[in-house]
A protein has these predicted regions:
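A glycine-rich, acidic short-motif signal
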Residues: 40-103
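Long alpha-helical, hydrophobic tracts
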Residues: 1-54
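Conserved active-site and cofactor/substrate-binding residues in soluble primary-metabolism enzymes
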Residues: 2, 6, 10, 20-27, ...
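Glycine-rich, aromatic-bearing surface loops/beta-hairpins
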Residues: 82-146
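Residue-identity detector for glycine
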Residues: 9, 17-19, 23, 39, ...
């Protein structure tokens, strides 16, 4: 069982580690607890496979692109008073989770296999520890008196 904050925090780091732009990674992280609540959290790992291409708006339709980017563009265009169609095969769970203002608190069941795969993506954002970085002031040093 994982809290909503644990889920969103890890999904944000994993999406950034996968190469997703910060704003889209934040959108996916916000949607993640809803996906966990709905029992479809495992889809997030598939969503971290690139490329993270934007959709194309052509004749009132959003065509192609990565599902997260396509849904985000669709939501933004609708908020701006336009009514585009979404020409992309995406999960209705993902659309609803990204549109939702609610943030389900949890706890939520998340498979360990999915959690480990997300951790692997998140680890790509870590900076390697070196003696030079420690000498330059990185880390807590020898004492941590916060």
């Amino acid at each position: 069982m994982r809290s909503a904050n644990e889920i969103s925090g890890l999904v944000l780091k994993a999406a950034r580690g996968a190469g997703m732009a910060l704003g889209c990674a934040e959108e996916l992280a916000h949607a993640a607890p809803s996906l966990a609540r709905d029992g479809v959290f495992d889809m997030i790992v598939d969503l971290l496979e690139g490329p993270f291409e934007p959709p194309v708006l052509k004749e009132g339709a959003l065509i192609g692109g990565h599902p997260v980017l396509a849904i985000a563009a669709w939501i933004d265009l609708r908020a701006a008073g336009r009514d585009p169609t979404l020409e992309h095969s995406v999960s209705p769970f993902l659309i609803n989770a990204m549109r939702s203002e609610a943030f389900p608190v949890g706890p939520h069941d998340v498979s360990e296999q999915t959690w480990e795969r997300l951790l692997a993506y998140a680890e790509r954002t870590f900076v390697p520890e070196t003696d030079a970085s420690r000498l330059a002031g990185a880390g807590a040093g020898l004492t941590d008196n916060d």
